[in-house]
Design a protein with these regions (language model features):
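Short histidine-centered beta-strand/loop micro-motifs
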Residues: 73-78, 96-101, 118, 126-129, ...
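His/acidic/aromatic-lined binding-pocket segments of jelly-roll/cupin-type domains
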Residues: 87-88, 98-99, 104-109, 128, ...
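Short acidic-glycine-tyrosine-enriched beta hairpin
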Residues: 120-140
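A short, N-terminal "cap"/entry segment at the start of jelly-roll beta-barrel domains
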Residues: 1-81, 189-190
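Histidine-centered metal-chelating micro-motifs
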Residues: 94-97, 115, 134-136, 140-147
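Double-stranded beta-helix
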Residues: 1-16, 143-190
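Conserved short histidine dyad/triad with adjacent acidic residue
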Residues: 65-73, 84-101, 140
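Glycine- and acidic-residue-biased ligand/ion/polar-headgroup-sensing regions
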Residues: 92, 103-115, 119-121
């Protein structure tokens, strides 16, 4: 049978392929670089596994990299191929304030139970709880947040995977989130 491949085939050396391997136990996590990083209840550790290059317009108002300014410069796998992947580790009761992205964001619970909340079409907040390997995918522009709601040990971290589209995606905290952070003294003023 004659068959002509339609897609370009690429061969990759082992050395080059190993640059695309990230070992979880070797990843560097960061707990800062976002407007709400130090706000009580929002503490979390973010791991930049694939991509997340610093976006244009970073640190202008509430616009930032989804993983914060430090982590966005230290991807374990440094590629820009249309998507980004990271992990969040957090204790129960912890997660970011409401924010949105300029591209899709998909969450996959790896361990524990995670609550994914969003603002619905009537301006009210709704949520679903995700157990391990459950997935939710938010369209661009939808205000959302996530929180570890695992029952049991309050000192036991759980892990959430997130995948965000684009090459240098942007996150922006909502006006209400920024006002709360400012009112409580968590934003730098110039």
């Amino acid at each position: 049978m004659k068959y002509r491949e339609q897609l370009r085939r690429t061969r990759v050396s082992r050395k080059d392929m190993l640059k695309r391997v990230a070992r979880f136990d070797k990843l560097k996590g960061f707990d800062g670089g976002l407007p709400d990083s130090r706000y009580p209840g929002c503490e979390r550790i973010l791991y930049n596994v694939i991509g997340f290059q610093p976006p244009k317009g970073e640190n202008q108002g509430a616009v930032t990299s989804p993983v914060g300014d430090k982590a966005s410069r230290l991807a374990a796998i440094k590629i820009s191929e249309g998507f980004n992947l990271g992990y969040c580790r957090a204790l129960p009761g912890r997660g970011p304030m409401f924010h949105n992205h300029d591209t899709n964001e998909t969450f996959i619970a790896m361990t524990g139970t995670w609550r994914a909340s969003w603002e619905n079409e009537k301006g009210r907040f709704e949520h679903v709880d995700l157990k391990p390997l459950d997935v939710i995918s938010f369209p661009a522009g939808v205000s959302r947040r996530f929180m570890n709601v695992t029952r049991g040990g309050k000192r036991k971290y759980s892990v959430l995977m997130f995948v965000i589209g684009g090459n240098a995606p942007r996150a922006e905290f909502t006006r209400e989130s920024m006002q709360e952070l400012a009112a409580q003294g968590y934003l730098k003023t110039s």
